[in-house]
Structures are given as C-alpha cells and as structure tokens.
Amino acid sequence: MTTIKTSNLGFPRLGRKREWKKAIESYWAKKISKEELDQTLTDLHKENLLLQKYYHLDSIPVGDFSLYDHILDTSLLFNIIPERFQGRTIDDDLLFDIARGNKDHVASALIKWFNTNYHYIVPEWDNVEPKVSRNVLLDRFKYAQSLNVNAHPVIVGPITFVKLSKGGHQTFEEKVKTLLPLYKEVFESLIDAGAEYIQVDEPILVTDDSESYENITREAYDYFEKAGVAKKLVIQTYFERAHLKFLSSLPVGGLGLDFVHDNGYNLKQIEAGDFDKSKTLYAGIIDGRNVWASDIEAKKVLIDKLLAHTNELVIQPSSSLLHVPVSLDDETLDTSVGEGLSFATEKLDELDALRRLLNQNDSVKYDKLKARYERFQNQSFKNLDYDFESVRTSRQSPFAQRIEQQQKRLNLPDLPTTTIGSFPQSREVRKYRADWKNKRITDEAYETFLKNEIARWIKIQEDIGLDVLVHGEFERNDMVEFFGEKLQGFLVTKFGWVQSYGSRAVKPPIIYGDVKWTAPLTVDETVYAQSLTDKPVKGMLTGPVTILNWSFERVDLPRKVVQDQIALAINEEVLALEAAGIKVIQVDEPALREGLPLRSEYHEQYLKDAVLSFKLATSSVRDETQIHTHMCYSQFGQIIHAIHDLDADVISIETSRSHGDLIKDFEDINYDLGIGLGVYDIHSPRIPTKEEITTAINRSLQQIDRSLFWVNPDCGLKTRKEEEVKDALTVLVNAVKAKRQE
C-alpha cells in the first residue's frame, strides 16, 4: 500500500495576534531597533516551523516567511532593484523603501496576487543587472535545519516571476532566459545544503495564457534538467486547473495541483491518464483559501481516487495558508458555527487525521472531525425569503439627465475635489474603539468622542478647501468587517486576521447564514457630519461584490445568491441615507476586479452578476442623488466595459502606483460618466509635489472629458498620519486651484 505523506505550501506570517505586523510597524516608527525586530521575527518564524512540525508534516515550507512580500524577496534575491533605488546596500531597509516609498522616491506598484486579497510588489526591470545578491532563502533553510525541521525551500518560479514583472527592454522570453542561470545557482546552493526538494510556485500556469508560455516553460525546465537539478524541483500550481499533460511532460520530480478550486478538471485529467506516475503528485485537497472545515470523508474518497493513478502521493492544502487566519484556539465562538470552521492550524490537523487513518489505520482524529462536520451540516442556515424582483436594477433616467439635476443640487466647481472616505485611525481612535468594544467606556462617551473627531475633520477638510467631504469612518475598524458586525448572517472573529499587503492586516467576516439589514448602519454619523457643513458629505458604504470577495463566503449557496442578499441589505442602507438628506452616496467596490475568475470562460457570468448586484444596491435612489463608487489595486483592461455598465455617476480609481497606465484602458471606450483617477499614492508616507499632481491631472484630461473629471487621492487615508494627510491634500487642492485658472 502507498504511504501517504503530508506537506504544506506556506503558512501565515502575521502570528496568532499579529506579532509580525506590530514588530515591523514598531521598527518603522523607530520604537525598536533592527536587532529587536530581527529577534521578534526569528522567534515567530521558529514558532511557525515548530507548529507545523507538531502536526507531523513530512515536509515544511521555508521561504514563505517574509518581512513584507515573497515576490519582493525574489526581486532582491536576483538584484531586480528599481532604478531609482539602485546603488544602495541590499538589506531590509531597502526592501521596506521599495515597498513603501520614501521622501525621495515613490514605491513600486502594488498588485493583487491573482484573484486573492493578497498584494505583491511588482518587480521592475528597467536598467537592472540580474545576479544572485541576497540569498535569504538559503539562510532560512539552514535555520530550519538547525531546529531539526525537515524543510523544503519555496521560491516563485521563473515563468510566474517574470510574467508578474514590468519594465525593461527585453522580451518576456529573454527575461526568463536571463534568470535561468541565477535560479540554477540558487537551486544548487539549496541542494548542496541538503534540500530534498524545492517547491517552485508557478501559479501563472493555471491562467488563460498558460499555453502561450509552454515553449519557454519547457525550455526553462529542460535547462534545469541539463544542469542536474530538475528532479529536485516540484512545480506547484494553485487557484485553478492546470494543463496536466503538458506539466507531466516536464522533467521535474513532482507536480502540485489544486483539487478544490479547479471545478473538478484536475481530477478528470488524472483519471484520463494525463499524469506521469514516475512523478510525485502533490494533491491540494484541503481548501487553503476559505475557513470552513473539510468534509473529511469526501477527502478520503478523493485520496482513494488519486491513489489509483499515482505511485507517490503527498496531500497538502490547495494553496498557501497565507490566505486564512492562524488558529481558532483564541476564539470564543458559538459552537453552532465554530464547529464548522478550520483556520490554518486546524487545516494541518485535518491533514494529520487523514495521514493517521490511511497510514496507521488510526481513525480517532478522523472520526472526531467527521462527527463535528456532520453536526455542523445538520443545522439549517437558510431561513429567509427574498424578493429580488421588486427592487430596481436600473436608474430612473440616463446619466446625461441625472447629472444635470445633481449639478443643480450640488453646485460643484470645475475639477471637483474629494477623498475616498477614510481618515487616519490614530492611536486615540483605536483606543476609544477598543475601550468601547470591551465595555471600558459607555456608549455615550464613545459617541461623544466620535462626534468630536468627525467635527474636527470636517473643519480640516473645509479649511483645506475640498469640495465634497466625508465623515472619516472613525467608527469603522475595516470597510468590510464593520458591515459584517452589523448585518445579520455574518460572524466576526476576534483574531481572524490575514495579510492584505505589507503590514496591512484585515479580519474578513465569515458569512454563515442568510444576510439581512435590520437597522441603519451609517446614518447617524453621516447625518451628524452633514449638519456641520454646507458642503455635501458623502455617505460611505461598501458594495455587495466587495463584501462577498473580502469575506469568507458560505459554500452551501451559490455565490450569486449570497451576493444579491448582500445587495438588498446595502440597498436598504442607501435608501436610509437618501431619506436622511444625504445627497452623495459612495458604494465602494475595490474588490470587483480581484474576484474575476482566472479563466476567461467564467468572466462574462461573473461580471454580469457583479454589475447586477451593484445596480440592485444603488438603483432605487432618485435622479438627483449622486452615486459614487471606488476601485483600487486593479488591472482594469479586462473589465472596463463592466465598470461602465455599473452606471455609477462617479467612479474613483486607484492609478498612482501604475503611473497613469490605467488611462490607456480608456482609449478604446467612450467613457461618458464621472471619473476620478487617483493623483497620488496614499500607501507611501511621501508627500506629492504640486507638479506631480498637475502632471497626473493633465495626463488624465488627455483621455477624459474635463466636465466629468474629479481629483482625489487613489485610496482611503486610514493608514496615513494626520500631518501627512493634511500636507498631501493641501498640495492636491492647490494644484487644482491653479489648474482651474488655466
């Protein structure tokens, strides 16, 4: 009988209580030394490695741990340093500056990692001299060995790394070939150090364009075969189906496939005989992207099917566990829902249960997990009826008519200015919210504090000269979690944090039941803010697509049904704001693009459903009420027509890190709705210059009608310091005032 082995593709960096984030931000704030930072992160890395060892994994990943982002780590490994940062020592401070920017230079672009809510730092190839320059991967592998951990190194593969890069004059194929000797050098150093195999992540090979990469992929891995290292390589794919017959023809030692998010195709390919049995199959059978406990009995059935077509089988999560929280141990959850959950640590336990059952005929842990899953499934979370048909899915009048009524009502100037919604969440703001949640202060004391903070920032905005104001969202910890706390059908955990980008962590709510609006969510704060000024104050909501994409979704209903349930709830809040006299309502959809399926065959239906849900949430208002939306971090070319179909009166889009590349997407579409392209990067502490903002405006106006153009930062300002925000917005408004005089 074949012995089943277990492995993992990656583990969360954050720590159970965000120790990683706190240490890094303390270092940035100069509250701890570099030595203290290094010690804290070393301790956390050790904890991660030993935890995985506790669950008897046969091989544990190293190289997944990072000080910021594993793609940026790979850039530094190969000396792919942005030209503006070249000439410096390659160390952690350089890494942080590339990721965050500094007073002299803008940060590198930040892009979604495939269709997840993780973001990577885009490698830049302009005038680089690739070489192996900082082999942190080797250092971390040796550290794992010192702990007696059976580890395997993890590195993003050459095809994926280059495809996710930008800049330079070489072709895609030329860049790959440039890197091959460097990958070889790194592989050899790891093998010489004792690596039994090396995990080479090539998720780009599950995308639509993967067939066009097959020639260069074959050339790359043939090169590694000639170098004598290919048999030590395991190509890991995840998030979708792969072209198994092609991958099986490559001269590597093993292949990793996703058997959760592949829509059943990978198993069909296995059963069709497309897998080369001389290789080891690394089967991603435990969902690495969602928090629900596995149907462990179904996983055993899947393993039995795979065993009929493989000689060596390793079971693993479907992807890195980076995308889920660390552990349920610190949560105090209602048993009715808690029994159905599985975070990163619990997923390792599921793998261990299957290993024990299949290798040792030890069913104790398996039987326990099976009974727990069955208890959860026997509950009913489908209790509500919905009347989707009675709610409008289109505005009363076309945009050309609406905008006339809106302009009469709002009386906005040429090139109106606004912000995206949130203002800095100072330590005081966070402390008051924590004290209120933990019942250390009264509701009245907390409400008084919020009103004072709202009033202070309304005055700041008026003094700066912004045209459309916001209340600042000081009552919100997160733009999705806030709504998860207030809508029926959501569960919000205490420590369910996941990394979004850099030190930015989010705590996605868990959708476990039918979603319903039961009371106003944002009306009080917005109405109070509006009472303080004659300028319009935007109501600020998160849209249904983003709430779904940034939550851990239930899997017992189709996505569209859950999305439309959320849309009806947001529609109720939109109407409540309108009834309270709010003239401008923003329904943010920053995650619309990121949820786009990796395979184009699913795009049309996804976008159709997304547009319908947004319109379900926003179309019931009167013509004179102006609907805004916001999107960020996205490559919009594929969805530009869907963005237009949303029929939002104004859309603001993050573009600053892409240096205006997005504007090209408007060349093939006559975009005739209001639009603001972000004119400066809020993810960096750097204050933009008046000239930079003017240049961004001028470039935008080459493609966009001036009468439709708004000027705004590229995203919310929650993570910035107060003085940074004031200074940057002052520069923005002054640049616009000068532009109005032209």
Swiss-Prot record:
Residues the record lists as binding 5-methyltetrahydropteroyltri-L-glutamate: 18-21, 112, 550, 594
Gene3D superfamilies, alphabetized: 3.20.20.210
Pfam families for the chain: Meth_synt_1, Meth_synt_2
EC number per UniProt: 2.1.1.14
Residues given in the record as L-homocysteine binding sites: 420-422, 473, 588
GO biological process terms on file: methionine biosynthetic process; methylation
Comment on bound cofactor: Binds 1 zinc ion per subunit.
Pathway participation: Amino-acid biosynthesis; L-methionine biosynthesis via de novo pathway; L-methionine from L-homocysteine (MetE route): step 1/1
Catalytic activity, reaction form: 5-methyltetrahydropteroyltri-L-glutamate + L-homocysteine = tetrahydropteroyltri-L-glutamate + L-methionine
InterPro entries assigned to the protein according to its UniProt record, in alphabetical order: Cbl-indep_Met_Synth_N, Cobalamin-indep_Met_synthase, Met_Synth_C/arc, UROD/MetE-like_sf
Name this polypeptide is given: 5-methyltetrahydropteroyltriglutamate--homocysteine methyltransferase
Organism of origin: Staphylococcus aureus (strain Mu3 / ATCC 700698)
Organism ancestry: Bacteria, Bacillati, Bacillota, Bacilli, Bacillales
